[in-house]
Amino acid sequence: KVKMKTIVIATKNAGKAREYQDMLAPLGIEVKTLADFAPIAINENGKTFEENATIKATTAANQLQLPVMADDSGLMVDALGGAPGVHSARYAGDHDDAANNAKLLLALKEVPDEKRTAHFHTTIVGIKPDGTKLVANGRVDGHILHQLTGENGFGYDPLFYVDELGKSMAQLTADQKNQISHRGRALRSFMKQFNDWW
């Protein structure tokens, strides 16, 4: 049996960690998160998703001397010029889903359905302690709803209507979400290149 290898996901978000766990566990890889280690100061001041993910992964890989995967994800709303974008988690308040969702609804109050187009984007960056880097991207297209819909997921999921499924992201099962989500798609793209990187 192959010896368990460890990879660190640069997040403390349990929901996000679970999505990685589901994808990486079948490969016999032990998944840890930043919550398993002493605090690491990470200055996420990038202008793009890839810059932020690279900062997170590099900082953690250097400090922990383990391979690290980091992602930066965001919601890009066309009517808002691509906002909230890299500021998605901190749009109204720091990782306050309710406040962020309320601010988004308010910003789009007068915007008709056909102009409420949006997409979720994820960039995943893997960095090994020797600096070897792997980058993958994923996106899912949709529209912003007028009210919170569905009980699952986190973040903007209840406001994001997935065009190809005809449901909000928060109405999907975990399996359905993994199939179509921006993170699921970025992760599958990442996994296709994983062996070469690993």
List each language-model region with its residue ranges.
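Anionic-ligand binding patches
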Residues: 5-8, 15-198
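Short, Lys/Arg-enriched N-terminal segments with co-localized hydrophobic residues
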Residues: 1-3
